[in-house]
Design a protein with these regions (language model features):
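Alpha-helical membrane insertion/targeting regions
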Residues: 1-227
Length: 227
């Protein structure tokens, strides 16, 4: 399972980089995005399962949150159906559980003698908890009005995919150094790919928000395959 996890992770990083910088909605973006989705779902699920076996609660939270973000990001640009609405409802409950659990573990880490819990400092737990709870509020908005306008759905797709890629990128570049090639270990450049994901995410979110005000409603329809 570890080999599958590693291979899926590397595939996700490469496909995610292509999808992140490709023109959104274009053929390259769609194809690399689908590869990214499947690779991330495999990587996050195998990572969570291995973490359950090894009783690593922090990685379980990261794996479940990543799986949730990718799945709901994919559904955000699909044609709304009752089946997808049910999946979103279950995912919303999972995100709420992850968020509350992460915040609780963060408080436990604050009170611990070492200042960490399972080797993870409080800010990491609080970050996961905050993201999960914010995503839950977004799910509630979708649940209340399933046919939310396309601009909202596109931004929902963007930030969730990008944050899932952020988690994967941070895990690879800022995690245990033995994962990296020798020339990158100890390099001060390691945080750069992680920060770039956030920079590009905010760029695309800003671009969508600015264009949303002046484009016709047809522009906001779900992204569809054209070839």
């Amino acid at each position: 399972m570890k080999l599958i996890h590693v291979l899926a992770g590397l595939t996700a990083l490469m496909a995610g980089a292509v999808a992140l910088y490709a023109l959104k909605g274009a053929r390259l973006h769609r194809r690399s995005g689908i590869v990214f989705v499947y690779a991330m779902l495999v990587m996050s699920s195998t990572g969570a399962l291995m973490s359950v076996v090894h009783l690593n609660v922090g990685n379980v939270i990261a794996g479940v949150l990543t799986f949730y973000l990718v799945l709901t990001a994919l559904l955000a640009v699909r044609r709304p159906t009752l089946e997808f609405q049910r999946i979103d409802a279950v995912a919303m409950l999972a995100a709420l559980t992850v968020g509350l659990t992460a915040v609780t573990l963060g408080m436990a880490a604050v009170r611990s003698a070492t200042g960490t819990l399972h080797g993870i400092p409080p800010p990491v737990y609080f970050m996961f908890g905050t993201i999960a709870l914010l995503a839950t509020f977004g799910d509630l908005r979708v649940w209340r009005s399933w046919r939310t306008q396309g601009g909202f759905r596109i931004k929902r797709h963007l930030w969730r995919m990008c944050f899932a890629l952020f988690i994967a990128t941070a895990s690879f570049f800022l995690g245990p150094s033995q994962r990296l090639p020798a020339f990158l270990r100890g390099s001060p450049l390691r945080p750069i790919p992680v920060l770039l994901v956030l920079v590009v995410m905010f760029f695309w979110l800003a671009r969508v928000s600015l264009r949303q005000r002046g484009l016709p409603q047809a522009w906001f329809q779900p992204i569809r395959r054209t070839s």
